Structure formats: C-alpha cells, structure tokens
From Swiss-Prot:
One of its GO terms (cellular component) is extracellular region. This is Ascaphin-7. GO terms for biological process: defense response to Gram-negative bacterium; defense response to Gram-positive bacterium. Keywords: Amphibian defense peptide, Antibiotic, Antimicrobial, Secreted. It comes from Ascaphus truei (Coastal tailed frog).
Length: 24
C-alpha cells in the first residue's frame, strides 16, 4: 500500500544520505 511505499522511499533516502555523509 501507500504506507509501505512511503516506508521504502524513506529507507532509500536515509541510505542515500548516509552514503553521501560517509563519502565526504
């Protein structure tokens, strides 16, 4: 459902941000 999509998108966003911070 929509909530599951939001959860997935949030996890992806967190992973992306974490990777960006780690690569600095």
């Amino acid at each position: 459902g929509f909530k599951d999509w939001i959860k997935g998108a949030a996890k992806k966003l967190i992973k992306t941000v974490a990777s960006a911070i780690a690569n600095q």
